[in-house]
Amino acid sequence: MGPNGNRPGRPLACVIGLLAFLAVVVGLGAAALPAAYAQTVGGVPKPTAEVAQPGGTSDETERLLAAIQVPVRDRLDLARRFRLSEEPVPAVVNSSRPSFTLGEKLSFWVGETDTQRHFEAIASLRYIGAHSYWWIQEGYDVRDEEVKASAKVFEDRIYPTNRAFFGSEWSPGVDNDPRIHIFIGNVPGVGGYFYSVNEYSRLINPYSNEKEMFFINIEAARPGTDNLASILAHEFQHMIHWRSDANEDTWVNEGLSELAMKLNGYNTGGVVTAFTSAPDTQLTAWGDTPDESIAHYGASYLFMAYFLERFGEDITRRLVAEPANGANGFNAVLEAAGRPERFDDIFADWVIANYLDDPGANQGYWGYTELDLGPVKVDAEHSAYPVERQATVGQYATDYVVLNGEGNLTIEFTGQRQVKIAANAAHSGRYQWWSNRGDDSDMTLTRRFDLSEVKQATLSFWVWYDIEEGWDYAYVEASTDGGQTWHILPGRYTTTENRSGNNFGHGWTGRSGAGETAEWVQEQVDLSPYAGGQVDIRFEYLTDDAVNRPGFLLDDIAIPEIGYWDDVEAGEDGWVANGFARIDNVLPQRYLVQLIEVGDSVRVRRMALDATNSGQLSVEDLGERLDYAVLTISGKTPFTTETASYTYRIYPAP
């Protein structure tokens, strides 16, 4: 989705409303449970371990998370595992290519962003191109010439440009038809969207249109206009990216879709200004609301445009098909190309480029050749010293502090040493299970239990969750056939409401507890139907196409009837994690502190920080040799969206 509003209910859209509709048809492949599941638990209670509380800046959790590849959500496999249909769910719903005629009417499911609901709309087929069908909703006055004008732009410019740069969509796709369907009509809350739900059978999601298609809001982009064409360029990249790397981080996917608009000759709107007006916007995250997300569009687009200018088309286009996500994807394509730079190196130069925008400086690394950014917002400006200030900054976001005045100065910086992944503490002890987070992903935590000696059983555990409400869901499940199929179990706080079509049963969504922030709550699940035998228990976290929250955390898991108790302190205890991680919720906070010195020439120096995140730089001849200086402060810790606090003190040098 783009800032003009292309996307609903978690589709990938253009900004008017931001949802996450970018599902996947990538297969994970179902298999029998691994041998590790054979470890069963009977009636031996496990004592609580004595574990030291965290101190210092251990990177234990960071190293663990860096080694995890978050699994892609495979809806065909989910349909089989959750027994959504008595018959196998087909990947392609038509055995032969369908036929449509001009003037034909068809009913479509349209997503409504604000309510997460869908409604049916009737549209007439007004144009058939070599690669597209054009459907106009009944009740809207649109001339044939307008439709043909937009169709010509899509067929002659957008389709070949996007395919040449980003790759191919799934074709002939779910409907066995190589043409893409374009619906234009009442699409509330967004400019338009691509939603991967439509790439699947209705047996998986009842609101699927079972077609490769885009939805365009006619109130935001009428046929015959550049606005409609730019939205199609944006959404077509999403469609291609879904086929190549379905669970790519939203910020990468959206940045490339904004880049697709530029490659096709269209303006990206006000997203650049939205970011330069709010540079303390995390590049590697995404906003929950349209207002929050516009600056993220700007950040991700600028980073992609900078990357393209610096490394060229070949390396940039490799990002789409690269299976590694986010920063890891950049590192992978750079390494494969034999380049020494890595994501953090590029980010450091990008921070400078966003302030200076001088393409003639430092081999072009400190500016943009094809963009004119305008001024970036300054967080603070000083001209009298000494001065001391405390502030916070996002991860992979930046505060710019301008230093004016005269003389020689000393800058002292101190930042916090640790940061959390989620804004909680373990319910007991130090460790907890974390679902991990990602888009279009499927994380599981599984263990086998022996209930053969009891007639009833209860699964008890404490849970803390902050999940994208109505779009992403977590479940607890049971299997008696070795993990081939699973039954979703109800809990105290689960819901069966399913406005988006994403809830497979009794799911947790939104925030745990009744407060404004998530809280630990105790869940109890009846396992009595499985008493008398062995049962596999699984926690599963499923996310949709775009936007994700901190996730789902577990602690103090018990089945009292068999004497089982696990406070997560002593290790994995037989749990098999696929995407989940046993964490202490402590990451070492890292910072990037740079000083831009502007005079007859420009120089950038980086502050070295010690183990306590403290460092010092000197500024000489301010007001004489130097016109001014700019201190840039960025958080630089992956795997979290929590902000980092810091303090700087600037005083005249003795």
Where are these regions (language model features)?
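Solvent-exposed strand-to-loop "edge" motifs in beta-rich extracellular domains
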Residues: 309, 450-452, 462-468, 540-542
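Extracellular beta-strand-rich recognition modules
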Residues: 457-463, 535-542, 568, 631
